[in-house]
Amino acid sequence: MATHLSHPQRRPLLRQAIKIRRRRVRDLQDPPPQATQEVQVQSHHFSPEERDLLYEEALYTVLHRLGQPEPNHVKEASELLSYLQEAFQVQPEEHQQMLRRVRELEKPVFCLKATVKQAKGILGKDVSGFSDPYCLLGIEQKVGVAEGSPVSRRRQKAVVKHTIPEEETHRTQVKSQTLNPVWDETFILEFEDIANASFHLDMWDLDTVESVRQKLGELTDLHGLRRIFKEARKDKGQDDFLGNVVLRLQDLRCREDQWFPLEPCTETYPDRGQCHLQFQFIHKRRATAASRSQPSYTVHFHLLQQLVSHEVTQHQAGSTSWDASLSPQAVTILFLHATQKDLSDFHQSMAQWLAYSRLYQSLEFPSSCLLHPITSIEYQWIQGRLKAEQREELATSFTSLLAYGLSLIRKFRSVFPLSVSDSPSRLQSLLRVLVQMCKMKAFGELCPDSAPLSQLVSEALRMGTVEWFHLMQQHHQPMVQGILEAGKALLNLVQDVMGDLYQCRRTWNKIFHNVLKIDLFSMAFLELQWLVAKRVQDHTVAAGNLVSPDIGESLFQLYVSLKELCQLGPVPSDSREVLALDGFHRWFQPAIPSWLQKTYSVALERVQRAVQMDTLVPLGELTKHSTSAVDLSTCFAQISHTARQLDWPDPEEAFMITVKFVEDTCRLALVYCSLIKARARELSAVQKDQSQAADMLCVVVNNMEQLRLIIDKLPTQLAWEALEQRVGAVLEEGQLQNTLHAQLQGALAGLGHEIRTGVRTLAEQLEVGIATHIQKLIGVKESVLPEDAILPLMKFLEVKLCYMNTNLVQENFSSLLTLLWTHTLTVLVEVASSQRSSSLASGRLKVALQNLEVCFHAEGCGLPPEALHTDTFQALQNDLELQAASSRELIQKYFCSRIQQQAETTSERLGAVTVKVSYRASEQRLRVELLSASSLLPLDSNGSSDPFVQLTLEPRHEFPEVAPRETQKHKKELHPLFDETFEFLVPAEPCQKAWACLLLTVLDHDRLGADDLEGEAFLPLCRVPGLTDCAEPGEAPQMRLPLTYPAPNGDPILRLLESRKGDREAQAFVKLRRQRAKQASQHAP
C-alpha cells in the first residue's frame, strides 16, 4: 500500500518559480507589479507515522547486522542505537518499546551474495597445457565442530561434492582452454547461522573423453606426455581438481572484494593460482512495514534524508556550517541498510539525489553535495531500468530543484549578501549544480519541455532586478510627502542602484559569465536605467522651472549621481539601443541658474568667513601665507570640482557655464583682495605697532601672490583645451580666446596691480633708509677706508632684507628687491653726479655699488645677474670706475681707449703712416724707422701740405726722461718719404704696459701760425717685436697705421680730468688734448 513517502505530489514548480514575460521593463506601470508567487518547498519533516516506520527500519537494520565492520565504521550496536534515538528524537521509553517490538519481529532470511569474478594462474591439467575450469560453490552449515580440531581441518580440505548437498550446490559455466578464466557470475546463498557457516568454492577442470590420437595431436612437451600416462591410469571422464577456497562467513565484512588463493587438497602443487571473489551480506523477506510496502531505494532515500537533516541541524545548533561529511554512525547505518537491501550503486545515487535535492530547499548546506549524485546518475543512466513511478519522482526532483534554484537566483542580492564572505562561492556552486543537472541525459529525457537554463536564469535575474528596485523604492519612501523629501528619497534610490551595479560588475558578473555566459551587469543596467529614468523625469517635472536653493542642491546631487550612473554603463556602441537616460541633462536645464548662483553664494560666504577668521599670521616657516589663502584655495578647488561634476554635455551651453564660473572666480579674487586689505587695516589699527603692521602687510602680499597662482591654474582646472575642442564647431573662431582668456588676464592684471601696490608700500619703507645711508657715505672722514664706510649701509640692508625674505614668498621678495635695486641705483646716480670731482667720494660709491650688487644677488638667492646689470647699473659702474680713478689712471685709460680706437680703424681717409718698430732688450733701445706717409689731407691753400711727424712715448709720466722727436719737414708733399730712424733709450717694463704707446702726430708746418694737425696714430708698445722675448729681433715688419682724429664731442675722461682744477698734470694733459681736438675740428673732412 502506497504511503506519502512513496508518492510525492508533483506540482508545476517552474511556473510558480518564474513567469516568462517578454515585455520590456519600460512598459511597467506604477504601482509596481505583484511579486511572483514563491516556490512551495516540500517539507523534509515526516509525520509521526512515517517517522515510526522509518525508525523501525533503521533499528531492524542495526539489530540484524552481518559481517565484520568496515575500517572506519562503528562496531558497537549500542552506539548506533543511541545515535538513531538522537537522530529521530525518540524519548528513552519510546525507544525501548520500539526496540523490543523490532526484536520480536521475524528475522530476515540471511543471504550471502557471492560473485565469482575471475581467476588467474590456475594449473593446466590438459595435454595442451590449459584447463577447462568451472566452479562449484555453496555454504556449509557446521554444527558442533570445534574450531581448529582435526575434523575441522579435514573438512576444509574436503571438496564441495562431499560436504554440501547437491541441491544447495551452485555451478558456474565452463571456460574452455584457459589459465585465466573470467566468469562474473553472481549467486545468492542462504544460511541460517553465520557463526557456524562457511563458504566453499571448488575449481575443477572438466574432463571429456578423447582418443589417444587426439591427445597426441595436442601434445606440446614432455609434461603433456606425462599427463597422457597419468590419465591412462584414472577413470574415464573424471574431472581434475584445481583448488578450493574455504571461508568462514563470520570472518567476512559486510562487503568483501578480494583475490583469494586456491588451496590444494594435497601438498603436490601448493601454488594453484588465485580467484577473485565479491561477497555481500543481504536480507530477504525483511519483516518491517516499510520494507514490505515501499521500494528499497525509497526507504533508503527517506532514511538518508532523516540522518542528513539531523547532521545539518546538529551543526547549526553548534553555530557551525555543515561541511557535507556525515558522522561515522550515519555512514555505518546507511552502508548497512544499502547493503542489506542489496541496493545498486545507481539506486543509491538516486536516493542520495532525492534526499539532498529536497533537503537543500529547506536546510542550509553546501550545494556541492549535489554534484556527486548527479555525476553518478549521469554515469550509470539507463532509462529502461527505472519504473514509471521512479521516473516521475526523479523528474519531479529535477523540476523542484530547478525552480528553487531559480527562486534563489532571482533573490540572489538578499540570499547571497556580500557581507558574508563565502556568498560568491555559494552562488557559483549553485549555478554549477544547475548547469550539471540540466546537462544530464536523465534531465533531457525526463524534462524535455524545459527551456534552456541560460534563458531561465536570465529571466529570473531580470525579474529579480525589477523586484529589488521596487523593494528599494518602498524602503526609501519618505514619511513626509514633499518635493524636497521626494528628491532625497530618489537620490538615495539612485545611489543604491549604483552600488548594486558596482557589485554586479565587480563580483556577480564574473560568476554568471563564467558559468552561463550571461552578462548580468549589462542586463541589470538596461533594466534599472529605464526604471530610474521614469522616476527622475517625473521628479524634475514636479520641481518646475523656478527652483529654490534647497531643491536646486538636491537636483544637483541627483544630476551628478545620474551622470555617474551613465558612465557606469556598458561601453557604448554604434548598434546599441537608445537608453532612457540618453540626454537626461535636459531635464535639469531649469536648475542651472540656481546651481550657479548657489555655487557663487557659498563661495562668497566661505571667503568672507575665511578673511574674518584670519589673524594674518604665517602658517609656518615654510608657508608664508595665512589661513585665508588656504581656505580660498579650497574654495576655488570646490568651484572647479563643481564645474567638473557638472560637465554639461551641450557644447554651447557648457561654454556659457564655464564663462560664468570664470567670471565668478575672478570676481571672488578681487573681492578677497579688498577684504584682506581691510582686515589688515583693522588689525593694524588695534595693535598700533609698525613692525607688526609690516608683518601683516607681508602676509597680505603673500596671500595675493598665492591667489594669483591659483587663478593662473584655472585653464587647467576647468579643462579649457577640452572645452575648446568641443565648442570648435559651435563658436566663432577666437571667441573662446576673447572671452575666457580676456577674463583671466583681467583678473591677473588686477591681482598684479594689488601685489605691486603692496610691495611698493613695503619698498617705500626701506627706500628712505637706503638713501640716508648712501648720503652719509660722503661725509665720512677721509681716513676711514671705503670698506668700513659702507658697513652701516650693509648692516641696514642685511637686517631689512633678511626680514623681508623671511616674511615674503620668493616672487614678492624678488619684486621687492627689484624695486629697491632700481631706487638704490637712482640714489647712487644722483650722489655720484654731485661728487664727480672727488675721487675719494667716488671710490666709496664704487665700493658701495660693488657690495650692493653682491648683497642683492645673495649668491643666487636674490636677483639674477640680468636683473642687476641694467643699463643704469652699467653706466653708473663705468662712471664710478672713472671718477674713483687718479688723474694718471685716467690718462692711462684715455690712451687705452685711443689704442682701441686705432685697432678698430681701417679707413685711411685722413691718410696713413708706415713704420718699422723693434726693441733691442740687450741695449734697452726702442728703434723706430719712420718710412713714409701717404694720402695726407691738403691743408694749405695751394692744395698741398708741408708734413712732418712728431714722435712721443705716452703717457708722459711713464716715460719722463724721453723727449719728443721730429722728422724733417717736406715741402708740398701729400705722400712724403721720410725714411728716418729714431732710437729711444727706455727700459722694457714701462713699454709692456697696456696703455704704453708710440704717438705719431702728423702735422702740417705753418710758418706764420700754429702747425695744423693732419692726424694721429697710436702704436701699442707691448706688441713691438723683441720686447717680450729674449732673442734679438730680426728684420722688423712694416706697419701701416691709419691716421685718426680725437672724438669731436669730447671724451668723458677728458671732461673728468678737466673738472679736477687743482691737478696741474691733469690740466696740462687736457689742454694739449683740447688743442689737438680743436685742430682736428678745423680740418675735419
Curated annotation (Swiss-Prot):
Origin: domain of life: Eukaryota
One Gene Ontology cellular component: recycling endosome
Protein's cellular compartments: Cytoplasm; Membrane; Late endosome; Recycling endosome
Topology within the bilayer: Peripheral membrane protein
SUPFAM superfamilies named in the record: C2 domain (Calcium/lipid-binding domain, CaLB) (SSF49562)
Cofactor requirements of the protein: Ca(2+)
InterPro entries: C2_dom (IPR000008), C2_domain_sf (IPR035892), MUN_dom (IPR010439), Munc13_1 (IPR014770), Munc13_dom-2 (IPR014772), UNC-13_domain (IPR052095)
GO BP term, example: positive regulation of substrate adhesion-dependent cell spreading
Binding site for Ca(2+) 2: 940, 946, 1004, 1006
Residues recorded as bearing Phosphoserine in the entry: 149
Compositionally biased spans, kind Polar residues: 35-45
Molecular function in Gene Ontology: metal ion binding; small GTPase binding
Binding annotation for Ca(2+) 1: 126, 132, 205, 207
Keyword tags: Calcium, Cytoplasm, Endosome, Exocytosis, Lysosome, Membrane, Metal-binding, Phosphoprotein, Repeat
Domains (record comment): The MHD1 and MHD2 domains mediate localization on recycling endosomes and lysosome.
Entry similarity comment: Belongs to the unc-13 family.
Protein known as: Protein unc-13 homolog D
Organism: Mus musculus
